[in-house]
């Protein structure tokens, strides 16, 4: 029998069919393999000695990584911490270059913590614009926030030469201890929210002292460490008091109409957060479960939130109670400033922070 003809090959002298396409493929494969081996050898043969060329970080990459941070940092905030640093420098007399480094460190830590807070609270607005993770996504926002924490530590090394030769202060431990406190406070705040556990006022104040007071203490402790003065009074009780005033004030304003533009309408209720007025209201009448059930629902509608604010205002008088607590704490802070020798800049900050009577948030939003 004759071999069948093929359109793709020839019949050799032995009558066997020879597939030219297979021969061509084999030849191409061999050639390709040779080229690949040449390219790999050429590219990676001396790779060990070229590794240092990979150890570069282009400025363009840095800008990409920091874009979520830059987005929020470029939106004006309250700047209370920066103002506090300047005010305390009336007493501590830190040289301006070191003071600016401290401001930068505290600013980095503060903005990074806000990036994380907004993710953890699933917020919509921050400073009147969409929160960072709604634009850049949660993974990139978290990574950037963590990166900025380490940038702050990098800045910290610039303060080491500013310490006096006999100073034994460990700046890294100082900052680390306060960041631990900050995360402890934040952790309890999140636990109460997610487990629907209403803390006592005392537990709430302890949480705030850890969480909000942490960045204030970092600033003042760094300033004390770098102060040229041989002796300084104990400023930390005042610093802690200011942190608590700041947070309770923030809690009150969140339920006020003046806060709606920047943070949204009664956002603490939507987050299910146990703020100072909410804690008081729940504890004031434990037989009434309306407010707890509203927090459980994490309402987004204006009607439910307006009802909750009216309940706190009219039934448990919690807004008035919060205002009276703030007034009491502000008076103590002013007395402490006077005892420490007076400080016009701090007194101006207290005047700025004082909450005047304002209408609670209503459904006329």
Swiss-Prot record:
Keywords carried by this UniProt record: Isoprene biosynthesis, Lyase, Magnesium, Metal-binding, Multifunctional enzyme, Transferase
Biased composition regions of type Low complexity, renumbered to the chain: 21-34
Positions marked as site (Important for determining product chain length): 149
Binding positions for Mg(2+) 2 per the UniProt entry: 117, 121
Binding site residues for dimethylallyl diphosphate: 126, 211-212, 247, 254, 263, 273
Cofactor: Mg(2+)
Alphabetical list of Pfam families matching this protein: polyprenyl_synt (PF00348)
Top-level lineage group: Eukaryota
GO molecular function: lyase activity; metal ion binding; prenyltransferase activity
PROSITE patterns, alphabetized: POLYPRENYL_SYNTHASE_1, POLYPRENYL_SYNTHASE_2
Catalytic reaction(s) noted: isopentenyl diphosphate + dimethylallyl diphosphate = (2E)-geranyl diphosphate + diphosphate; isopentenyl diphosphate + (2E)-geranyl diphosphate = (2E,6E)-farnesyl diphosphate + diphosphate; isopentenyl diphosphate + (2E,6E)-farnesyl diphosphate = (2E,6E,10E)-geranylgeranyl diphosphate + diphosphate
Gene3D superfamilies given in the database record: Farnesyl Diphosphate Synthase
Region (Disordered): 1-36
Enzyme nomenclature, EC number: 2.5.1.-, 2.5.1.1, 2.5.1.29, 2.5.1.10
Sequence ranges of Polar residues compositional bias: 1-11
UniProt record similarity statement: Belongs to the FPP/GGPP synthase family.
Stated role: Geranylgeranyl pyrophosphate synthase that catalyzes the trans-addition of the three molecules of IPP onto DMAPP to form geranylgeranyl pyrophosphate. Does not show any monoterpene nor sesquiterpene synthase activity.
Protein name: Geranylgeranyl pyrophosphate synthase
